UniProtKB/Swiss-Prot annotation:
Residue ranges annotated for the ZP domain, each copy included: 366-632
Propeptide: 636-713
Protein name as it appears in the record: Zona pellucida sperm-binding protein 2
Biological source species: Bos taurus
Protein purpose: Component of the zona pellucida, an extracellular matrix surrounding oocytes which mediates sperm binding, induction of the acrosome reaction and prevents post-fertilization polyspermy. The zona pellucida is composed of 3 to 4 glycoproteins, ZP1, ZP2, ZP3, and ZP4. ZP2 may act as a secondary sperm receptor.
Length: 713
């Protein structure tokens, strides 16, 4: 037998703190006491026993004095146990012994025999044997979360398991009446009778050899930690039951995080506020992961301003749910173990991602101001993962604006009037919807069907409040003009200056312009009095022939905006109130630098063309008609109408562009009209041509007469 005067501190092992830490039994034993000399039976064991997971601790009464130095562990016959290694501490009056080598099992108990010399007899020393016991916990009694706080929506709960005998003692007609509840630590500890505890947020249930206690988050003694929108609750709890001959003490520290997890397309995030505790491990799906292994296991931990755990969705399970399309992500349970207040405590939560609905995933509350909805699709947004190469939107005419294969991400910029986007009016909102399709990444090609396809409805809306205008009306507005049937007609004209008062007539072409002289152009809708329509330019360009499709071409306006690759940009001019329907007009000035070559004698005829469309400001495409040139050309191009909806209009005649060194400069007046010199030039050309024709006819007549004369001779 080995006996050491100093040994380990007697703290329960880590396994016990995880699963048994909440239970110890402290009682005065009045069980069988055997003596070698029957006349020397001791009526009671002079001490108490505390039972741990793999050992017991005996605490002797101080009345024993120096006799404790002679205490030892023996077998039931009083013989030394050679394999028993125990620790005797005379100063603390304790003896610690492991169950495995120092006890034997008797009727479901770990039984140990202690002896020490009793020298109260003046004649001879006699040895007294004491049997002390701790219960044997039956295998399989605990579930995987035994010893952990179970978190629910409004309360936390903890379960203490009994052993045979203790359960019988507490199973009387009023088993709960002997219990008292102590909550809090140190000076803040409060002792409550069971009846008081029931009225202050606690509930106790004893059945089937176990005791369950439920604690509301606002119960007496509960400490509340909060940070932002995250909350954590913790309470030290001790239950004491006193009966003749024994005292039962059950203790635990309950801890619970009450907030639901948040989810995005790739991760599930759990947030816990700052509190005096440190995370030790994370357990789920029969895996226990230490903190230093979290990152390698797909879990990212942030510890600044509280604790945040980001779980990759590849770790989560999926299940069919009426709330989600097509699956809901969740963990069947998640156990977090912390070290706090010199204790190891655990809590169990049941996290799952919250979904919007079975038919829609809302891409954003409001559609963008320039008439789009922006959608992000991640490869791991579903399980199994998506094949991003098979993604398509609506009628498949839309292509992704961004593809990031390494991030498993695709972004769409879907126009509200294209790609098959639909709209409807509902509760004062204009709701736009489209559908995204994709195939699963690991789907065998031979099993393609409708069920194998991922479908996600995306939507955004404009509310009626977005269209409100505050006005002060002093008179009734004029009646809305009736809609005029028939095709729309446009015209493109040029003006002498930016007053736009009198355009050039058809007889004034070609209109002459020199270097540094702007060309003032106007596109307008003809023969319409509907104030609700708006003219929107698409493209304007110049060609060297009358054919709008001929090459080369010079861009003037692209997607309704000045051409940003031209150093001499087009200037838009506002349409004032001098016209009845300003929205029926578009005015702009073109710089001649874009067309004139470096040859000082350069002259050229240039033809101007524009494509445009008509917008109905009362219909659902109004946001598109108000798009700003701050949007990139590529984005604006996606909002444009089809080629069938656009109309192309050209100037009635060409513009004659001349450089400063041209010999015709003096022949042009300040208004740009050709003068008599230029008219004489044109007349001279006609006369020369006529003279040539006459000379040709005369030659033919002479040759014919000469031939006739020769034949007559």
């Amino acid at each position: 037998m080995a006996c050491r005067q100093r040994g380990d501190s007697g703290r329960p092992s880590s396994w016990f703190r995880a699963d048994w830490r909440s239970f110890f039994l402290s009682f005065t034993l009045l069980t069988s006491v055997n003596s070698i000399d029957v006349n020397q039976l001791d009526p009671a064991f002079p001490g108490t026993v505390t039972c741990y997971e793999n050992r017991m601790v005996v605490e002797f009464k101080r009345t024993l004095g120096n006799k404790i130095q002679h205490a030892s562990v023996v077998d039931s016959l009083g013989l030394k146990m050679l394999n028993c290694t125990y620790v005797l501490d005379p100063e603390k009056l304790t003896l610690k012994a492991p169950y495995e080598s120092c006890t034997k099992r008797v009727l479901g108990q770990h039984q140990m025999t202690i002896t020490f010399m009793n020298d109260n007899t003046a004649h001879r020393q006699k040895t007294v044997l004491y049997h002390v016991s701790c219960p044997v916990m039956q295998a399989g009694r605990h579930d995987q979360h035994s010893g952990s706080t179970i978190c629910s929506k409004d309360f936390m709960s903890f379960t203490f398991h009994f052993f045979p005998g203790l359960a019988d003692d507490t199973a009387g007609p009023k088993p709960q009446m002997g219990w008292t509840v102590t909550v809090g630590d140190g000076e803040r500890a409060q002792n409550l009778t069971l009846q008081e505890a029931l009225t202050q947020g606690y509930n106790l249930l004893i059945e089937n050899q176990k005791m369950s206690i439920q604690v509301l988050f606002h119960a007496t003694g509960v400490t509340h930690y909060s940070q932002g929108n995250s909350h954590l609750y913790m309470v030290p709890l001790k239950l004491t039951h006193v009966s003749p001959g024994q005292t039962i003490i059950l203790s635990s520290r309950l801890i619970c995080a009450s907030d639901p997890v948040t989810c995005n397309a790739t991760h599930m995030t759990l947030t816990i506020p700052e509190f005096p505790g440190k995370l030790k491990s994370v357990s789920f799906e029969n895996k226990n992961i230490a903190v230093n292994q979290l990152h390698n296991s797909g879990i990212v931990m942030e510890i600044a301003n509280g604790l945040r755990l980001h779980f990759s969705k590849t770790l989560l399970k999926t299940k069919f749910s009426e709330k989600c399309l097509p699956y809901q992500f969740y963990l069947s349970s998640l156990k977090l173990t912390f070290y706090t207040q010199l204790e190891t405590v655990s809590m169990v939560i049941y996290p799952e991602c919250v979904c919007e609905s079975t038919v829609s995933i809302v891409s954003g509350e409001l559609c963008t101001q320039d008439g789009f909805m922006d959608v992000e699709v991640y490869r791991h947004q579903t399980k199994p993962a998506l094949n991003l190469d098979t993604l398509r939107v609506g009628d498949s005419s839309c292509q992704p604006t961004i593809k990031a294969p390494f991030q498993g991400l695709v972004k769409f910029h879907i126009p509200l009037n294209g790609c098959g986007t639909r709209h409807k009016f509902e509760n004062g909102k204009v709701i736009y919807e489209n559908e995204i399709h994709a195939l699963w990444a690991d789907l065998p090609p031979s099993t393609i069907s409708r069920d194998s396809e991922f479908r996600m409805t995306v939507r955004c809306y404009y509310s009626s409040s977005n269209m409100l205008i505050n006005t002060n009306v002093e008179s009734l507005p004029p009646p809305v003009a009736s809609v005029k049937p028939g095709p729309l007609a446009l015209t493109l004209q040029t003006y002498p200056d930016n007053s736009y008062l009198q355009p050039y007539g058809d007889k004034d072409y070609p209109v002459v312009r020199y270097l540094r002289q702007p060309i003032y152009l106007e596109v307008r809708v003809l023969n319409r009095t509907d104030p609700n329509i708006k003219l929107v330019l698409d493209d304007c360009w110049a060609t060297s022939t009358m054919d709008p499709a001929s090459l080369p071409q010079w861009n003037i306006i692209v997607d309704g905006c000045e051409y940003n690759l031209d150093n001499h940009r087009t200037t838009f001019h506002p349409v004032g109130s001098s016209v009845a329907y300003p929205n029926h007009y578009q005015r702009f000035a073109v710089k001649t630098f874009a067309f004139v070559s470096e040859d000082p004698a350069f002259s050229h005829l240039v033809y101007f063309h524009c494509s445009a469309l008509i917008c109905d400001q009362l219909s659902s495409n109004f946001p598109l008609c108000s798009a700003s040139c701050l949007v990139s050309s590529r984005s604006r191009r996606a909002t444009g109408a089809t080629e069938e909806e656009k109309m192309i209009v050209s100037l009635p005649g060409p513009i004659l562009l001349l450089s400063d060194g041209s010999s015709f400069r003096d022949a042009v007046d300040s208004k740009g009209h050709g003068t008599s010199g230029y008219a004489a030039f044109k007349t001279m050309v006609a006369v020369v041509a006529l003279a040539g024709v006459v000379a040709t006819l005369s030659l033919i007549s002479y040759l014919r007469k000469k031939r006739i004369t020769v034949l007559n001779h």
